[in-house]
């Protein structure tokens, strides 16, 4: 390819970008600007997916100023085209440089391919039409961005994702209780925003220990490839010799890094602030300490980032756990103008308390007192609620009262103090969780361990934490010793595994080496099939271990994991958990149990803790169980109590005496009960209703389940693979291996690895086996497959034989598919209202459109393929008639195309105006409606209608049909 600045090219893979201009090139790359969509692309010279745009004599062009002209002659100078044209409005002849051509232009000439005998197979034309129809449907689907995640269909998660994901620059606090899936909610919101092109650049800040968990979750659940940033990676961008420091944060669009690292590296923090991100996600945001006088450095950094990044998601503990002051600090990060003073916030919250009590009465279906009705009238106008209150307090039937209560609750939710900013679900509110059953196994400490402890104690070589791991102390004496040959925990574990032959068992150890040694013990002693899973393994190796464990037949019965290695992995298909070592704080304990105790777990969880008598292990287990009840219930107050009692607990764990330990446990238990009671009293039922979505959320889950059960995606995708030339191998168990081949119609299938990939269309199987790709309409392989067809030349022109005894032999029909589309900047989401829409015409020899009488499928059933030689002869003979029909189709398409564009404008106006009016109404009673949100929507409405006015249409594909008697 010869490139020159000023040349006009189009992208083969992204037709919607419009007509591009070469703006720069070097030895390896070429830069091209697409003014129509306000985009710039940089391609490798050797493989740029670009097509040179050169018009020929007789072609019609459009100037940037809007006038049209016909090309009279073409001249080339220095690789640039100069067109002598005749304007269509005044017949003036003028020379136009190619740089002056209109940017909003469509290029696709199936007739050129047809007349040059580049004829596609009939099935390719059918695939193209189906791909266009599916593309249109998916752009307009309300389930887009919600159905493609490797996650169960949990109503409250889907509700939050839909509610927040459709907003412009959402700024919210996700504060669900542990185990309810805040990470999944954040991922679903992120995916919706990315698919809608509302955001492109994303920064996720997490604690250092959770970086890989987020990396795995984003990749495995959402097919999002994030980059992990640390000092080593960023140092590669520092080049003192150039005297110019490149900003590493602009090198990638999707970035995960540790918040602590940014705090410790002011230079990197400054670079992140200059990174021009669209969305910021902060996990464990409750660790950002704040007070009015001295906010922490971490808090101030997040404050600075949230000031320059439009969309912000904070994942945090529940407000009740945080306390009001800390809760205010998170809200201040999201909207400092609204939450400017803690005292004002406190006063507002106190005013809301009576309303919360009235809500409780409504939920309990009690008759509201006069005082409660007055409190509700303070939040809603009396005239708004009076009709509803009359029904609620009357002798109306139960159904009428239920409707009135529902309407009143809906109004209250919209006007709730922090309803649009805060989402918080509790296990009690969501329900559907299994029980957790604790089994303590008390064993005698082997003399080998006791002797090793005594000797190393005398030498002063034991640190307190090591007392929890006697096998490691023993190995200090003799590194080659096989401790598992005499450790009674190993024999107990083997007996447990043998007694649960049909069950899967997850065993969590503190470290990788113990997991590896236990695998050896199970294999050598009893030949038990097991897999190991730890932080020293690559993601692919962990996937394989996870898949081996998930297999029902011939799979591993036991998975032996280190505590860090299992982060981010959920094994809901198992219900037996062995804690070979106990974590040293309640949050880590909950993380371990959370591998099995997730929403969607269908069976009670059996938790086994083998401990040695009279050791720190058993005392810690006792404190967890009797003090916190942390094994059998989630313990949201665990971290608070551990911080409060930690020093005293450590004393009891490391001393030989256990005097007063029982009293200490009892004291912890009393504090736990008190905190639990306070949390329950502080529950905001109205907020919970807003957060879980009620019946609408359930309907959303049902809609996705119905689509999951449809075979439409499977039929289309397998047909797509067949035609493209992707190899398919059915493995049974609802999974297939797809691999690229050397005979594919395209040189590369985006998203399909060279070594192939195993895929499934079944959600339950995808949840059980993380090594499988879960194919949905939102999956990159499916989306890329559709793009390959609709943006390429496959199926653009075809010839077919119509077998019909009623028609004279040689009767000509021409089937044409036009695309109605609008070119617009990312983020405007015009595809909601006007996606690339196929409009089918079926013309007879007289130019009559028969498409309304004869459907695509109905016609297809009567068609037979025509050989290439015969098709070439038919085209040659019938070319004049075909050319005449193509001209006629350009007239036929005008009215229906204009109607579709008008409908899109009406839909855009109605949809955006309704949302603007709703926000204006809410703003009058709810201060959390940000003025800039309404302003953005109004600008969006104006620009959307303007660009829809400029929508146009183009001929995408055509099929010549000739009749025969047989």
Curated annotation (Swiss-Prot):
InterPro entries: Helicase_ATP-bd, Helicase_C-like, Helicase_RapA, P-loop_NTPase, RapA_C, SNF2-like_sf, SNF2/RAD54-like_C, SNF2_N. Belongs to the SNF2/RAD54 helicase family. RapA subfamily. ATP binds at residues 176-183. The gene is rapA. Transcription regulator that activates transcription by stimulating RNA polymerase (RNAP) recycling in case of stress conditions such as supercoiled DNA or high salt concentrations. Probably acts by releasing the RNAP, when it is trapped or immobilized on tightly supercoiled DNA. Does not activate transcription on linear DNA. Probably not involved in DNA repair. The keyword ATP-binding applies. This is RNA polymerase-associated protein RapA. Keywords: Activator, ATP-binding, DNA-binding, Helicase, Hydrolase, Nucleotide-binding, Transcription, Transcription regulation. The lineage of its organism: Bacteria, Pseudomonadati, Pseudomonadota, Gammaproteobacteria, Pasteurellales. Its EC number is 3.6.4.-. Residues 489-643 form the Helicase C-terminal domain.
């Amino acid at each position: 390819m010869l490139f020159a600045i000023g040349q006009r090219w189009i992208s083969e893979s992204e037709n919607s970008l419009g007509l591009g201009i070469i703006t720069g090139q070097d030895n390896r790359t070429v830069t091209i600007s697409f003014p129509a969509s306000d985009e710039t692309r940089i391609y490798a010279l050797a493989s740029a997916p670009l097509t040179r745009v050169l018009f020929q004599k007789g072609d019609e062009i459009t100037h940037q100023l809007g006038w049209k002209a016909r090309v009279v002659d073409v001249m080339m100078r220095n690789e640039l085209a100069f067109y002598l044209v005749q304007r269509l409005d005044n017949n003036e002849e003028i020379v136009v440089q190619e740089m002056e051509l209109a940017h909003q232009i469509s290029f696709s000439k199936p007739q050129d391919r047809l007349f040059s005998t580049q004829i596609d197979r009939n099935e390719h034309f059918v695939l193209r039409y189906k791909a266009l129809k599916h593309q249109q449907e998916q752009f307009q689907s309300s389930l887009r961005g919600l159905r493609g995640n490797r996650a169960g269909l949990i109503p409250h998660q889907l509700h939050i994702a839909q509610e927040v994901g459709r907003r412009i620059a959402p700024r919210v606090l996700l504060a669900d209780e542990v185990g309810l899936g805040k990470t999944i909610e954040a991922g679903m919101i992120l995916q919706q925003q990315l698919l809608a092109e509302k955001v492109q650049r994303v920064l996720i800040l997490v604690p250092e220990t959770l970086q890989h968990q987020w990396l795995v979750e984003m990749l495995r659940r959402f097919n999002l490839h994030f980059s992990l940033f640390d000092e080593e990676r960023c140092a590669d961008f520092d080049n003192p010799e150039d005297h110019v420091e490149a900003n590493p944060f602009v090198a990638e669009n999707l970035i995960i890094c540790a918040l602590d690292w940014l705090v410790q590296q002011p230079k990197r923090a400054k670079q992140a602030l200059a990174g021009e991100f669209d969305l910021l996600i902060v996990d464990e945001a409750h660790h950002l300490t704040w007070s009015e006088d001295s906010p922490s450095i971490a808090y101030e950094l997040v404050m600075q980032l949230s000031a320059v990044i439009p969309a912000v998601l904070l994942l945090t503990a529940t407000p009740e756990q945080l306390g009001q002051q800390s809760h205010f600090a998170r809200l201040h990060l999201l909207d400092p103008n609204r939450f400017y003073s803690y005292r004002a916030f406190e006063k507002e919250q106190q005013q809301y308390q009576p309303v919360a009590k009235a809500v409780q009465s409504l939920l309990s279906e009690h008759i509201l007192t006069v005082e409660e009705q007055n409190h509700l009238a303070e939040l809603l106008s009396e005239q708004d609620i009076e009709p509803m209150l009359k029904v609620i307090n009357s002798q109306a039937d139960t159904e009428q009262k239920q409707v009135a209560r529902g309407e009143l609750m809906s109004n209250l939710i919209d006007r709730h103090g922090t309803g649009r900013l805060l989402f918080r679900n509790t296990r009690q509110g969501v329900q559907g969780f299994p029980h957790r059953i604790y089994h303590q196994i008390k064993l005698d400490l082997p003399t080998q361990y006791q002797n090793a402890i005594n000797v190393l104690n005398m030498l002063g070589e034991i640190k307190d934490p090591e007392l929890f791991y006697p096998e490691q102390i023993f190995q200090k004496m003799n590194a080659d010793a096989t401790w598992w040959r005499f450790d009674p925990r190993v024999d107990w574990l083997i007996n447990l595994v043998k007694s649960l032959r049909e069950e899967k068992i997850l065993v969590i150890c503190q470290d990788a080496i113990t997991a590896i040694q236990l695998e050896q013990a199970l294999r050598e002693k009893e030949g038990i099939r097991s897999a190991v899973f730890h932080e020293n393994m690559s993601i692919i190796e962990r996937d394989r271990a996870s898949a081996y464990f998930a297999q029902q037949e011939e799979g591993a019965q036991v998975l032996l994991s280190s505590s860090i290695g299992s982060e981010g992995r959920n094994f809901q298909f198992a219900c037996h958990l062995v804690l070979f070592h106990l974590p040293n704080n309640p949050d880590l304990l909950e993380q371990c149990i959370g591998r099995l105790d997730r929403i969607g777990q269908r069976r009670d969880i059996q938790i086994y803790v083998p401990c040695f008598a009279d050791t720190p292990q058993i005392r810690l287990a006792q404190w967890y169980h009797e003090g916190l009840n942390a094994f059998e219930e989630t313990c949201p107050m665990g971290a608070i109590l551990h911080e409060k009692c930690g020093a005293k607990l450590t004393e009891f764990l490391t001393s030989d005496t256990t005097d007063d330990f029982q009293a200490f446990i009892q004291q912890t238990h009393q504090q736990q009960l008190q905190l639990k009671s306070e949390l329950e009293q502080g529950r905001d039922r109205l907020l919970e209703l807003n957060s879980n979505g009620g019946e609408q959320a359930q309907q959303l889950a049902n809609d996705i389940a119905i689509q999951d059960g449809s075979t439409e995606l499977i039929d289309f995708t397998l047909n797509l693979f067949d035609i493209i030339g992707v190899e398919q191998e059915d493995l049974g168990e609802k999974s297939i291996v797809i691999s690229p081949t050397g005979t594919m119609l395209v040189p590369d299938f985006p998203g399909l690895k060279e070594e192939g990939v195993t895929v499934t269309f079944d959600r339950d199987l995808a949840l059980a086996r993380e090594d499988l790709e879960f194919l949905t309409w939102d999956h990159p392989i499916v989306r890329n497959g559709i793009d390959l067809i609709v943006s390429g030349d496959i199926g653009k022109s075809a010839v077919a034989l119509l077998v019909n005894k009623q028609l004279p032999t040689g009767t000509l029909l021409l089937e044409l598919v036009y695309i109605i589309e609008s070119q617009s900047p990312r983020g405007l989401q015009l595809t909601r209202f006007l996606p690339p829409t196929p409009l089918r015409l079926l013309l007879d020899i007289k130019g009559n459109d028969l498409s309304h009488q004869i459907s695509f499928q109905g016609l297809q059933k009567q068609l037979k393929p025509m050989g290439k030689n015969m098709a070439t002869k038919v085209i040659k003979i019938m070319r004049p008639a075909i050319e005449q029909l193509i001209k006629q189709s350009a007239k036929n398409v005008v009215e229906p195309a204009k109607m579709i564009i008008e409908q899109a404008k009406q839909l855009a106006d109605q949809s955006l105006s309704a949302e603007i009016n709703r926000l204006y109404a809410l703003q009058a009673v709810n201060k959390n409606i940000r003025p800039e949100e309404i302003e953005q929507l109004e600008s969006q409405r104006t620009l959307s209608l303007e660009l829809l006015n400029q929508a146009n249409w183009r001929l995408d594909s055509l099929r010549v049909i000739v009749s025969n008697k047989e």
